[in-house]
């Protein structure tokens, strides 16, 4: 059973596969069926990613909190023949927490817009830091081939030195390459600058 849906962008989302709603076995990136999302690490359920603890926690909360809210008063009524105010209040609190759990895990519109840009060049609307290393490396190599064909530098310093000269249609590619290249400070700053320029041209 796949539950704990978070970070949804245009039908793409992160979720967790559970056994009997109790044991999390894998976190997955799930996308609408498309040849572009057929990547290393994919199976019939989705693309295997690193453990996303928000998805795991919300998966538990969305299943067990409403169940506990319903079962608690039923058990007390069956065992003791009536309900105490404390039990009723506890059920209300559990239901309120369940509602919050279903509303949690949404991305702000700014982040959705950023992930859409990545999706235009990779097919994946997910931050590369959440992917398995093998999946990330394959996507990075693919983007690198396109960068090389376009004669665009492939180091953070090189990219920034020609940033203003890169044609706007190529900016999603350059931004995607910088995001997939690594999580160290130089690449993060390079990616941020690339995205800033893309936004300026997109206005």
Predicted regions and their residues:
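A composition-biased, non-transmembrane "mature-region" signal
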Residues: 1-203
């Amino acid at each position: 059973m796949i539950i704990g849906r978070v970070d949804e962008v245009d039908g793409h989302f992160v979720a967790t596969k559970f056994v009997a709603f109790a044991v999390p076995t894998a976190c997955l990136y799930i996308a609408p069926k498309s040849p572009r999302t057929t990547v290393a690490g994919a199976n019939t359920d989705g693309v295997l990613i690193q453990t996303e603890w928000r998805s795991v926690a919300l998966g538990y909360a969305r299943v067990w909190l409403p169940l506990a809210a319903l079962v608690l008063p039923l058990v007390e009524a069956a065992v003791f023949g009536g309900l105490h105010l404390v039990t009723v209040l506890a059920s209300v609190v559990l239901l309120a927490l369940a509602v919050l759990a279903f509303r949690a895990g949404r991305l702000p519109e700014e982040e959705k817009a950023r992930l859409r840009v990545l999706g235009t060049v990779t097919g994946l609307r997910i931050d590369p830091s959440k992917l398995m290393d093998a999946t990330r490396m394959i996507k990075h190599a693919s983007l690198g081939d396109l960068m090389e064909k376009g004669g665009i530098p492939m180091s953070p310093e090189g990219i920034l030195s020609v940033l203003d000269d890169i044609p706007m249609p190529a900016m999603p590619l350059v931004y995607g390459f910088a995001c997939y290249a690594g999580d160290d400070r130089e690449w993060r700053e390079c990616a941020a600058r690339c995205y800033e320029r893309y936004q300026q041209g997109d206005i």
